[in-house]
């Protein structure tokens, strides 16, 4: 697996962090519609900034989305409205959240 591909995948540690962050009463739920996940790590795999745009596989770029909301985010004309909602959600979760820090850069992201 190439380093860039690895950097954009959510590893188990990231999936657990996303799942815990997006939980209600200890159970992961879709952050958009509120549906409960069928299993603890089943839905912790949506990128705020897509892999195709270089989005990193880090919790700050991850969202728990049900399959319906994930498809709507990836493939519908609702993307911009949903993206605004997710941006506010992630900014609320992480004090120093920045979209620029979520994009893979060859050679590292600490510049």
State each model region's role.
Residues 1-29, 56:
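Short, charged surface segments at domain edges that flank catalytic/cofactor-binding sites
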Residues 2, 52-64, 71-111:
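Polybasic, low-complexity binding patches
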Residues 10, 27, 48, 85-86:
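Phenylalanine-focused residue identity feature
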Residues 22-25, 37, 94:
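A broad structural signal for alpha-helix termini and local helix breaks/kinks
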Residues 29-64, 81:
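Histidine-centered nuclease catalytic patch
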Residues 35-36, 70-72:
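Detector for the c-type heme attachment site
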Residues 47, 69-70:
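Histidine-centered divalent metal-coordination motifs
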């Amino acid at each position: 697996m190439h380093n860039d591909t690895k950097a954009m995948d959510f590893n188990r540690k990231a999936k657990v962090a996303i799942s815990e962050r997006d939980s209600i009463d200890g159970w992961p739920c879709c952050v958009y519609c509120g549906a409960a996940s069928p299993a603890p790590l089943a839905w912790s795999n949506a990128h705020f900034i897509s892999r195709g745009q270089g989005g990193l596989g880090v919790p700050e770029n991850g969202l728990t989305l049900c399959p319906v909301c994930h498809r709507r985010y990836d493939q519908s004309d609702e993307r911009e409205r949903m993206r605004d909602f997710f941006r506010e959600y992630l900014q609320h979760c992480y004090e120093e959240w920045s979209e620029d820090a979520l994009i893979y850069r060859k050679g590292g992201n600490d510049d």
